[in-house]
Amino acid sequence: MVLEMLNPMHYKVTSMVSEVVPFASIAVLLLTGFLLLVWNYKNTSSIPGPGYFLGIGPLISYLRFLWMGIGSACNYYNKTYGEFIRVWIGGEETLIISKSSSVFHVMKHSHYTSRFGSKPGLQFIGMHEKGIIFNNNPVLWKAVRTYFMKALSGPGLVRMVTVCADSITKHLDKLEEVRNDLGYVDVLTLMRRIMLDTSNNLFLGIPLDEKAIVCKIQGYFDAWQALLLKPDIFFKIPWLYRKYEKSVKDLKEDMEILIEKKRRRIFTAEKLEDCMDFATELILAEKRGELTKENVNQCILEMLIAAPDTMSVTVFFMLFLIAKHPQVEEELMKEIQTVVGERDIRNDDMQKLEVVENFIYESMRYQPVVDLVMRKALEDDVIDGYPVKKGTNIILNIGRMHRLEFFPKPNEFTLENFAKNVPYRYFQPFGFGPRACAGKYIAMVMMKVTLVILLRRFQVQTPQDRCVEKMQKKNDLSLHPDETSGLLEMIFIPRNSDKCFTK
């Protein structure tokens, strides 16, 4: 009787087991397959870097970039894993390279002319398939690059000396506008206004409010830097991006007003030759249907923000280095007096200012502003023996590269590092190849003119022996001083007087 009662239970248990086993088997098989996939994924890559570990590795590396900033994260990973390593940004494989042979390979080949970044982020700031800086559409990028190259060479390069010299002189004559109560000069603001004024006179030619535009350029740059790598979900939560939206809108609205004034001037001019410049060329291309209005506006915006964004900080660092190294200042002044003397600086002086040029190069090597380059592989390739798949993101850590190879004293600031010719594969402050900086030649002229005119009039000092080495900095898309920390002002002492330039 008992056996008969238990018999149905036996059949029920057997039935349950027979149903559960297939599901358990499937789960075990899926788990095994997933683990095999993870195991194989980790071992298919011969490139050093953090492990994948069930997707946790990519998440951690992405969060590190968002938290530390691009430049700081790159330096961390290169120091930890080597000079050619693999991480992930937004789930995409990304190579960080600070080895000169690999950097040279990437820069010289045309299948690395695209950059990478968050599509919604680039759309947000107006750079997605527009302008030149982060335009990742190779066809559209080539189309606008022609206009930039024309404006930044030839007649534009020749005019730069006079235009820049006039702007510097004008701003130094009203230095009180950028001095505080102690008489210390806000050098960053001074340089940003000079660079904006020079760029405007060369490329747009419409009067503007320097003070207001400089502030808005900084807001735009902060938004660009903050949004470049943000995940898509960030742009679905308005309160997260609202402050950046305002910064972008403020600058773009001002630029649109200025460009509309330029359009009216062009179309009402009796002689078109009287207003031919970069902006005019673009507006005429728009009229011919070759470029959209949005693309034209973005190109002009980028041309005007480029120098105030990077070159102003570069010169700022140079002046701090001069203040700390009086023997370098002495060498510079000796050459300036020999080549230029008391007359106005001319175009033919540029090639003769060799010490000034070496100083500029050493400053950009020792304390760079743009110390990384972002690219994307447009086809499969092999770099120094490592396979690189199409679509792989690449960051060239040139700031670190400049301290690793060739230079006799890589960790010191000294003109000895450029006493001999440096092969360009070891020193790339402007890049080279098909996507090299379009403004590298005009930038050198601009920096030489700025240094010559400023140093002829003033000796520069820093309060309390401040220096670039101890300065707080932020290393993200570019390397800037932390302006919230203060202590960035300098003392300008007129060379024709022993009296300190204070109130």
Swiss-Prot record:
Its main location: membrane. It is found in: Membrane. It is a peripheral membrane protein. Belongs to the cytochrome P450 family. Catalyzes the formation of aromatic C18 estrogens from C19 androgens. GO terms for biological process: female gonad development; lipid metabolic process; response to estradiol. Heme binds at C437. Its EC number is 1.14.14.14. It catalyses: testosterone + 3 reduced [NADPH--hemoprotein reductase] + 3 O2 = 17beta-estradiol + formate + 3 oxidized [NADPH--hemoprotein reductase] + 4 H2O + 4 H(+); androst-4-ene-3,17-dione + 3 reduced [NADPH--hemoprotein reductase] + 3 O2 = estrone + formate + 3 oxidized [NADPH--hemoprotein reductase] + 4 H2O + 4 H(+). This is Aromatase 1. Keywords: Heme, Iron, Lipid metabolism, Membrane, Metal-binding, Monooxygenase, Oxidoreductase. Its cofactor is heme. PANTHER family: AROMATASE (PTHR24291:SF43), CYTOCHROME P450 FAMILY 4 (PTHR24291).
